C-alpha cells in the first residue's frame, strides 16, 4: 500500500519542473495566453491525442518525433488551434521551435499544443515576439493553468505526493483546460501531467491509456471530439522512485480530478452528473449506455431543469443499442429508486425526493440493466441557455 | 412516366378513407387529442417502428398481430406514450380495442398508436368515454392531423393524385407529427399513410423500408430515438390501380414532405438544413458523416447563430469516423465554397456571403469528401433557447 497526499504547485510540484504563463497579445486586455511546461532535468514525453481524423498541426508535429522521446519543453497557446492548416501549420511550428531552441539552447525537442479557432494560420510572429518573457526556471503553475483557459470558468490543476511504505516518495502534478471556446472552434480538452517518478519509458503510453479510459474518455460536454484533444505526460525520473501500482493509481486520481473538473465546467454547465451503468452484458455495452446518457440532449436538458424524468433515461438506454429489458432495468437518482424491473415507483413523493437529488451540484444517476456484469461510469453535465449563448452568440 | 398532382384531404384523400379528431380531455381546454383513420373498404396495414429496445405497448400490440394484416382502423392518442408500462400497457390496449369493436362491429383488427408521457398508464377510461363521438365516415383529415400534435408548431399533412400514362390513377395521403413533447417524454415521430392503390401486400413493408431510408431515417431533431416512432401504411386497393415505380416515387414524395416538415418543426427550431455529403467512400460512410452533422450540438448552435463556422463542420466530419482527408475535402454553404481541398477560402467577403445563405429559413451545407462515390443527404435543424426552454422548463 501507499499514501497519497494532495499538495500545491500543479505541474511544478514534481521535482525539477517549471511552468509559467505569459501574455502574447492573443487574448484581449493583456490576459495570459501562452504557457510553457519545462523540465530542468532530461525528461521523456508520451501523449494520447484526439481520434479526430483532422488532427491539428501540433499533434502531427509531435507524432513526427515519435511515440516516447526525449523532450523537456512544451509551448501551449490559446486562441488558435492550428487545425485544418495543412503543411503550413507544421511549418509554422517548425519556425517557432527553431527560434525557441536558438533562444534557449538547453531545450530538447520542444513541442507545441494549441487550442482555439480552427482554420486560421498560427499567429507565430506574435508568439515569437513574446518568447523573451519566458524565464525557464519560473515555478508559476497557476499562471500556466490560467493561460491555457478559453471559456473555462475556473482553472484546473492538481498535484499529489505519493509515499510508499518504505518512506520513499515521488510527486505527480497536472493542469488541464476544457469547457470549449469563446471563438468559433471546437471545445478542446488539453491536459499536461508532470512527474518525477522513475517511470520506465516503455510503460508511459500504456499507463496513460489505462488511466484515460475511465477519466478523460468517460466525460462528455457536448459529444464532439475536437481536432486538438491532448493528454501529455512528462517524466524526468528526478525522485528515482517508482512503484507501478502506486503510480498508476496516482495518475488515475490526477486525471479523474481534472476530467470531472472539465465536465463540471462544461460550457454554461452548473451540474456534474455521474451516469453509473451496471449489469450490462459487457463493459463495452456499459460504456455505450453510459455515454449515450451523457450525450442525450433530452437527458441534459432535464438535468438543467432539475426534472427527474426517468422516462428519458429509460428511452435513451433503449435506443443506445445495448441489450436491455424493461423487466430487468432499475433506475435511481442518487439513492432514490424510481423504476424497478417493470414497476413504476414514481409518485409525487418519490418525484420530490428525486428532484431534491437533482438540485445538488453533483449527483449520480444509476441504471442497473440486470443483464450481466458489465459496468462503467461516465460523467456529463447539463445543457442550458448559457450553452446556447456561448455557442451561438459569440459574435455579439 | 407518370404525373403527380398535389391534392387536398390528407389521409382522407384516397378513396374509401375517413379520419377525424375528437377531444377526450387528455389535452387541456377541450383541444383535439384523439384521432382515428379508417378505411370503409377492407384494407391491409404494414408499419415500421422505432429501433428503441423499449418499444411502447401499441407497437408490441401491433407486432403481435403480424407484419402485414387485415386492418381498417387505427386509434391515435396524444399526451400518453403507453411506454415502459409492461404487460399492463398491452392489457389497456386490448381492453380499449374490445370496447371499440363492440361499438363498431365493422372494425377489423383495430390498432393503436400513442405519443406523450413515458411511464404512466394509458388513461383508457377517458379515451373509452370519448368513443361515442367517433363517426366512422367523417372525412376530417385536418382535424385528425391536429389531434395528434404535441409540441408541433403546425400540423402536417399531404396528399397526391398519381396519374399513369394510360389515364388511370390512384391517390396517396398522409399525416405526421414530430417536434417533441410539452410533457416529459421523448420527441416522438408518428406518420400515417393511406392509399387506394392496389399495392400487393407482400410489397408493402419493403416499399416502406425503401422510402423511409432517405426520408424519416434521414432527419434528426435531437438525435434521440423515441420509444414510439411509427410509420404506418394502410392500403385498401379501392382504385384497382398500381404501378410500382410510380407508387414508390409517390410514397417517397409524401414521406419526404412530412419528414422535412418534422425536421423544420423541431422543438423551437427556425431553420431546416440539408446536409449533403458526397464523395464518401460508401453510402454508409456518407450517412454516418451526414447524420453526425445533423446531431452535432456545435453545428446546431452555429446554425442558430447564423454563423458560417466551417471549422465545426470540418471537425465534426473528422470525428465522425469516416475516411477523410483535409486535402480532399470541400465545404460549401449553399453555393458558397469556403474550404477547398486544403485551401482556406474564408475571408470577410466569403464569410458574409456564407452568413447570408444561413439567414435563409432553409438552405444546404455541402461536404464533398473527395474520396469515393458515396452520397447521402440528412436533414436537421438549429438548436436555440426555445429548445432548452421546451425541454427544461416544462414545469413552470
From Swiss-Prot, chains A, B:
Pfam families: ArgJ
E.C. number: 2.3.1.35, 2.3.1.1
An MF annotation (GO) of this entry: L-glutamate N-acetyltransferase activity
Catalytic activity annotation: N(2)-acetyl-L-ornithine + L-glutamate = N-acetyl-L-glutamate + L-ornithine; L-glutamate + acetyl-CoA = N-acetyl-L-glutamate + CoA + H(+)
Pathway: Amino-acid biosynthesis; L-arginine biosynthesis; L-ornithine and N-acetyl-L-glutamate from L-glutamate and N(2)-acetyl-L-ornithine (cyclic): step 1/1; Amino-acid biosynthesis; L-arginine biosynthesis; N(2)-acetyl-L-ornithine from L-glutamate: step 1/4
Site (Cleavage): 187-188
UniProt KW keywords: Acyltransferase, Amino-acid biosynthesis, Arginine biosynthesis, Autocatalytic cleavage, Cytoplasm, Multifunctional enzyme, Transferase
Binding-site positions, substrate: 150, 177, 188, 267, 391, 396
GO biological-process terms attached to the record: L-arginine biosynthetic process; ornithine biosynthetic process
Keyword Amino-acid biosynthesis listed: yes
Site (Involved in the stabilization of negative charge on the oxyanion by the formation of the oxyanion hole): 115-116
Enzyme class, broadest EC rank: transferase
Main location: cytoplasm
Location of the active site: 188
InterPro entries: Arg_biosynth_ArgJ, ArgJ-like_dom_sf, ArgJ_beta_C
Gene3D superfamilies: ArgJ beta chain, C-terminal domain, L-amino peptidase D-ALA esterase/amidase
Record-level GO cellular component terms: cytoplasm
Location of the protein in the cell: Cytoplasm
Assembly information from the UniProt record: Heterotetramer of two alpha and two beta chains.
Similarity field: Belongs to the ArgJ family.
Role summary: Catalyzes two activities which are involved in the cyclic version of arginine biosynthesis: the synthesis of N-acetylglutamate from glutamate and acetyl-CoA as the acetyl donor, and of ornithine by transacetylation between N(2)-acetylornithine and glutamate.
Protein name (record): Arginine biosynthesis bifunctional protein ArgJ
Gene: argJ
